[in-house]
Each structure stands twice: as C-alpha cells, then as structure tokens.
Amino acid sequence: MKVLFINSVCGIGSTGRICTDLAQQLEAEGNEVKIAYGRKGTVPEQFQKYAVRIGTDFDCKMHAIQTRLFDTHGFGSKHATKEFLKWAEEYKPDLVWLHNLHGYYINVEMLFDWIKKHPEMQVKWTLHDCWAFTGHCSHFTMVKCEQWKSHC
C-alpha cells in the first residue's frame, strides 16, 4: 500500500515524530510511505527518504501575511499546493493520512477538492489539536476561548 502523510513538519516536534514513527512501522510491514510537510526545519537524516516538501519558506511567509491581513489561514499557498497535488497525483496514494494542516503551508480547500476527486483513496485524519473544528484556534482550552462555538 502507498501511504501519504500530510503534516506541518517531518521528523521534528511531536507531530513530526508521530508521523515518522508511523512511517517506520508501516514501512516495516511492507508499505511505501511518504511524508509531505510544509514548515521549515531540518528533516533528520534517517527520515529524509520519506520527506516531500510542500512549498518553500517564502510560501509559508506569504501565507502567514495573507492570514494576518485577511484572516484566511488555510487558504493561501495556492501555487505550493497546486505543485504538491501534481506530485501527489503521480504518487497515487492508497491512503492519505492527514495530521496538522495548519502552519501556513497548504491550501485546505484545494487539498479537500483533490481528495473528493479520489473516492478510491482511504483518508484518515489524526486531530492533534482543535484547529480543524474551531475556526483555526488550535488550543482553545488553554486560552479559555469559547467563541468558536458561536461566531469564530
């Protein structure tokens, strides 16, 4: 099986290590695995065989600026996402396993449109935080914010 993880980082931080731990286990079971990531940071040598970068540091910075100006987190990075999806189309994963989609590196609308075009793919989403369902607040309990329930 061909597995594609999508996460903000690869091999570093908590979610990056979770992805690489899963990748190693899946590979040991005979699967082919790639981890698409978007944030800068050095991918440790032993995990570079999995790593596929989405965009550049400049793309992330532009997405962050767009987010600050227009409150559109997750809707920037159109060119980077388009190029990544071209690569993913060629890779043809059997399973797409989503992790952290926030981090100014991928356009979620384009990503989900692509996923919808491939009903044959399995999709899993590990929710490491609350960003996906709160209007982009990853840790609402920590900051004691309940606005996401009515108007965020």
PLM feature spans:
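N-terminal subdomain of nucleotide-sugar transferases
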Residues: 1-48, 91, 117-121
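Short catalytic/ligand-binding loop motif for oxyanion handling, primarily in non-cytosolic enzymes
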Residues: 12-14, 42-46, 104-107, 131-142
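A conserved catalytic-core segment of Leloir-type glycosyltransferases
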Residues: 28-95
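Short N-terminal targeting/anchoring amphipathic segment
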Residues: 85-106, 121-128
